[in-house]
């Protein structure tokens, strides 16, 4: 009985403190990193994560290779056969450093383009790697910052689209956890879902729909004039809608280099 009470207290205290609105986040399908010059990382990604309007966390799909100036911390990250690295990237000078952390998953062992990454201005308290939900699919890479978890996702395109299954996977991961702290976490999946928001919502199971919300911009996020890039926020056991909104990050859009996706930001209304 005492153990149950302690667990309940921990659960409630984490739930009370958690708030996704404390973060400014964004997602962008980079469509590769312009490997020889890394220009997309050094120009466009840098623009999103530095300066006055910098986001706290950036989810990247088709991340190519990490910037060569990023330094591997050597941290061993347990994962289900999917290599994940933690790197520190100094955006400024050695005398006045401005460091961010890159969590990089080399999903594409051949071409190297279709990799996943999360960039955070804080070091992650924990890293999550969830296996692909379908043959030929990609894993989910996530980090925990305090009481909130953020994932980068890249769903399969066309007929074999696995976007609903990816959302279900995150929901089940936290719902079924034996750790009350994990159960209480708010979570957000950011990425290229390769599916319109309304279509995704229709294909989620009822429990997942009740425990989550889709936060999407009222504009196309790809040159195809489709809205494919957005966020799904939820809590697997104690969901409350958040005052969050999504929109195209137009500053980065104007200077982006050869990606057919636009960066999408999510922040408090």
From Swiss-Prot:
Its EC number is 3.1.-.-. Changing residue 261 to A: Loss of DNase activity, no cellular distension, no G2/M cell cycle arrest. Pfam families: Exo_endo_phos. Changing residue 260 to R: Loss of DNase activity, no cellular distension, no G2/M cell cycle arrest. It is an enzyme of class 3 (hydrolase). Part of the tripartite complex that is required for the CDT activity. CdtB exhibits a DNA-nicking endonuclease activity, and very probably causes DNA damage in intoxicated cells. This damage induces G2/M cell cycle arrest, chromatin fragmentation, cell distention and nucleus enlargement. This is Cytolethal distending toxin subunit B. It comes from Escherichia coli. The gene is cdtB.
